[in-house]
Amino acid sequence: MHNLMGLNSTSESIHSNVSCTCNCKRSLFQTMEISELEFVQIIIIVVVMMVMVVVITCLLNHYKLSARSFIHRHSQGRRREENLSSEGNLWPSESTVSGNGIIEQHIYTPRPSDRLSVPSFLQRDRFNRFQPTYPYIQNEIDLPPTISLSDGEEPPPYQGPCTLQLRDPEQQMELNRESVRAPPNRTIFDSDLIDSSVYGGPCPPSSNSGVSATSYSSNGRMEGPPPTYNEVIGHYPRSSFYHCQQPNLATPSILESNRLQPGNHGLDSTITRSKDKDKQKGQPF
């Protein structure tokens, strides 16, 4: 029994030793894995921090350089303005009187830095040129909205960037037709006008040269200025003088009746004047 008990005890001790060694190995592997993971995490964190530091330093350097350049330009502009103002104040005093009574002439010689420097107003214009002007200025001064119209080289029904439609297309075409007319191809002789005013009613236009048809309306009134004496006499043949001399009594009554008509007042006055002159010239014959 004791032997058996001893064997059992030895076997148990062996099993316990084996289990201990296995547990120890497992714990070592786990600790090694954990330590490796932690090391990798630490390395990643350090790299990220270094990258962030580099980015921040680059940004700070960039803004520092831009701020320095801006301050330097501003200081240079102030110095130039001060130099120009001081030179402008000293400019009128070109000659000064010394203590000995000798007049000393001061000649202005520009410095090389002044020759190479750009005036301050040009710098201001250059900086203001790049400032945003639209739409702030337009809102401040309350300008109306811009309307893009044609440049006039397109046909009357404007097509393209034109956004303003003043009239209907048909109305615009009708206006274009009415505004552009062909010259008249028919003329009215002065004798036809006189006959129409005396006997009433318009006569058909003749082919002879005379007053244009556009200057003669439907009611027989001359719209333009009255014809001159030479024009009226030039159109009459010689036989018309004798024809006008014979009815000496009938023509005044006809002329007086025509004078009463308000529509033919302008034409009748010219007719009477021309006939009176014809009578005066026709009496010796």
UniProtKB/Swiss-Prot annotation:
Residue ranges, Lumenal side: 1-38
Compartments where found: Early endosome membrane; Golgi apparatus membrane
Chain spans, region Disordered: 76-97, 201-222, 256-285
Amino acid composition bias (Polar residues), ranges on this chain: 85-97, 206-220, 256-272
Keyword entries, A-Z: Endosome, Golgi apparatus, Membrane, Repeat, Signal transduction inhibitor, Transmembrane, Transmembrane helix
Topology in the lipid bilayer: Single-pass membrane protein
Motif (PPxY motif 1): 155-158
Cellular component GO terms held in the UniProt record: early endosome membrane; endosome membrane; Golgi membrane
Cytoplasmic-side positions: 60-285
Annotated protein name in UniProt: Protein TMEPAI
The species this protein was found in: Xenopus laevis
